[in-house]
Amino acid sequence: MSLKLGVIGAGAIGKEHIRRCTQVLQGATVVAVSDINADNARAAVALPGVQAEVYADGHDVINASDVDAILVTSWDPTHEEYTLAAIAAGKPVFCEKPLAMSAEGCRRIVDAEMKAGRRLVQVGFMRPYDEGYLALKKVIDDGDIGAPLMLRCAHRNQSVGENYTTDMAITNTLIHELDVLRWLLNDDYRSVQVRFPRSTSHTHARLKDPQIVSFETKKGTLIDVEVFVNCQYGYDIQCEVVGETGIARLPEPSAVQMRKSASLSTAILTDWKDRFIKAYDVELQAFINDVKAGQLHGPSAWDGYAASVAADACIKAQGTSEPVEVTLPECPAFYKR
């Protein structure tokens, strides 16, 4: 039986997920779509193969009798509202990051889900489904390079718009590292420090770019993450793990190497959707399969909360030159099953 999905938000990522669920994945059908811009919703349901009803409001999608599960891909500040509504309706919900705009908002979702008595929330952190990150985690978990001592990472975007601000380098960009590095190391953050090097001439008045974000984990691993969102040359994700007996690096995306005109070159991607397109497919297929099986296993509301707690500390650290403590409570047994 096909899982019937309702999608709230039909912008870039919402439309892409609707296409993915309709044309690529198995076992699900999009039956309801809403967007604050009705034209976006109508364009999404006009995609080949989509046969869905357009609703004026996200709550109408959640409450529709023929909708089994929800995808929240709307404007970030609405994520908490719609996720809580889905929990209240007893419907599994896949919420794109961020889960909420603050750690307090994420905690409200965690508390509501625990009160419901079963996992209903998966957060759209796709990197744990990426083949490269999975291979890197296996190296670490198998002890092939000994205990991880240091990590050097980078998250680089070609450019961002005038509405992108200094704090968004944390909440919209670094948020992926905040999740995937916890997962990669099976460790939590103890403290964070943010430094600003010389600023690129390609930024604007409301954005300090690049930023260097440095963490110490509870096990003592040191992590440096470069966040550079106007790097100009492409979309580039790097992760190097220095262990006791060796070094492991996140593999580069597959690309043709060219020798031409006295030069050796390899193309670099410019679109984040292309860099993790397979991971997006795998994470949503896993959500569909898990909902149908009655048990979610993907990134949880607690993972969303943990990332948000770290993000709040990072934003606080942007305003001081000193390290800031990351205070994450003990993970409830509910999320350790």
Swiss-Prot record:
GO terms for biological process, alphabetical: inositol catabolic process
Record family assignment: Belongs to the Gfo/Idh/MocA family.
Disulphide-bonded residues: none
Organism: Klebsiella pneumoniae (strain 342)
Subunit composition and interactions: Homotetramer.
UniProt lineage: Bacteria, Pseudomonadati, Pseudomonadota, Gammaproteobacteria, Enterobacterales
Pfam families assigned to the protein according to its UniProt record, in alphabetical order: GFO_IDH_MocA, GFO_IDH_MocA_C
The name this protein goes by in its record: Inositol 2-dehydrogenase
The reaction(s) this protein catalyses: myo-inositol + NAD(+) = scyllo-inosose + NADH + H(+)
Domain of life: Bacteria
Molecular-function annotations in GO: inositol 2-dehydrogenase (NAD+) activity; nucleotide binding
Keywords, ordered alphabetically: NAD, Oxidoreductase
Role noted for this protein: Involved in the oxidation of myo-inositol (MI) to 2-keto-myo-inositol (2KMI or 2-inosose).
